[in-house]
Amino acid sequence: MVIIKKTHNSFSLKHRHCNHTLKFGRLGLKILSFSKITENQFNLIERLSLKFLKNLSGNKKLIKIWSLVPFNLTLTKLSSEARMGKGKGAVYSRAFFLRPGSILFEFEGVSKHQLTQISSILRKKTSFRIVEVQLPSK
């Protein structure tokens, strides 16, 4: 049983590199601005990219996608009629705080052209800036 605890910490807006290199895939999507994404928004982004990749490849190629972003926030909410001093409220969703330079997705089995098409679609759907990255060729 997983217990989701309420978080009280706020995240600093300092530029810190901890998840800025590709670990598994050959291509990836990197974030260039601070942002907070809820679990529903992240699932929507993931479903859009999967759907677009399946349409492009025609289910013929083996495509792998990794997302290494941990959910580090719990979003809580009290009812609108609650008075002061009644606590923080119930957890209604999870989210994570993104810093510039963090990798959102890593891809394997995707061409550079397909990745640019995916990123152009995701730029229209999200409020943060996205850039494509790739491993240097040997």
UniProtKB/Swiss-Prot annotation:
Keywords tagged on the record: Mitochondrion, Ribonucleoprotein, Ribosomal protein
The keyword Ribonucleoprotein belongs to this UniProt entry's keyword annotation: yes
Top-rank lineage group of the source organism: Eukaryota
PROSITE patterns: RIBOSOMAL_L16_2
Keyword Ribonucleoprotein: yes
InterPro entries, per database record: Ribosomal_uL16, Ribosomal_uL16_bact-type, Ribosomal_uL16_CS, Ribosomal_uL16_dom, Ribosomal_uL16_sf
GO cellular component terms attached to this protein's record: mitochondrial large ribosomal subunit
Localisation: Mitochondrion
A GO molecular-function descriptor: rRNA binding
GO biological process: mitochondrial translation
Family membership noted in the UniProt record: Belongs to the universal ribosomal protein uL16 family.
Name of the protein in its database record: Large ribosomal subunit protein uL16m
Record organism: Chondrus crispus
